[in-house]
Amino acid sequence: MLDKIPNMDDITALVGQSLYDVWQKLCSAIDEQYDMDCIWNSGGRAWTYEYKYRRGGKTLCALYARENCVGFMVILGKDERAKFESGRSEYSESVQKVYDDSKTYHDGKWLMFEPVDTSLLGDFMRLLAIKRRPNRK
């Protein structure tokens, strides 16, 4: 948990206006579909901030921010990987490449994206739907 939660100006100053817009659109899309607890943390060694979407002790996804960069991470477990692989042709080539290049750990395949625009937003939301059905009507 962070001592001071970053505000809009803090994130904008860190990532820049265009990436802040990507961050905002991604958060809005997730918030529209999912009722989740949102938790701010430090981003560890590689990132300045982590903004995690969780519910019932399970993480849906996390957004990361560092200087001039935004990250979006989703971890797919064994069953979720099977669902992705059965429908992989529905995803863009760049999402398939990140999937193929991502390391598989004991708890799943960690997919880290560094979006520069909103072109992959639909793919990101499909990945989240594999993990959890949207719970907002």
Feature locations, PLM:
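Charge-dense, helix-prone N-terminal extensions
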Residues: 1-137
